[in-house]
Amino acid sequence: EMCIRDSAYASHGDTKHILLFPEDPQECFEFSAEAFNLAERLQTPVFVISDLDIGMNDWVTDKFEWDDEKKYDRGKVLNAEDLDKMDNFGRYLDIDDDGICYRTYPGTHPEKGAFFTRGTSHDEYARYTENGDINEQTLTRLVKKFRTASELVPNPIIDLSDKQGSCLLYTSPSPRDSDT
């Protein structure tokens, strides 16, 4: 489906986005909350891709339970004390080598942590550049981030049969309930 590709590469084509595919209304509920958590931690859009069956048909489900004790992972956020310890704040510095950079909230520090940037044409310090080597470093970092994301998203349901073929099928309702 076009919406899957468009969601996965929604930008200039130089980044990927996280896609979650719920199998039923319960997972829609759970994945919607998890999408916000992942978006904060990974600093990238996360799309919950629901199909027509889930969205248009009536379903009998258990009552959705919200966990008021759930704590969200806001990701790598520097506070004023962290910034005071740094010589320079680099918005796109990959200090931990996982593709995810540290960020700040507006107003965190009177002198450090603010930045202005545009697109992917920037260096580690959010300064504009069209240098090809720096752009390659940025894209390499984004690939690392996507690999890190693969360790954080819900595990896929993979059903391999003895049949040979070359067809990938995405569908619902639940693949766990399918006889095929």
Across the structure, where does each feature detected by a protein language model lie?
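N-terminal low-complexity segments that are often proline-rich with Ser/Thr-Pro
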Residues: 1, 177-180
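Residue positions that mark polypeptide boundaries
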Residues: 3-4, 171
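Flexible glycine/proline-rich, aromatic-decorated loop/lid segments
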Residues: 5-14
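Fold-independent oxyanion-binding glycine-rich loops
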Residues: 9, 21-24, 34, 50-52
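Short beta-alpha connecting loops at secondary-structure transitions
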Residues: 14-21
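Short beta->alpha junction loops/turns
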Residues: 24-25, 172
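Flexible, low-complexity linker and terminal segments
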Residues: 31-172, 176-178
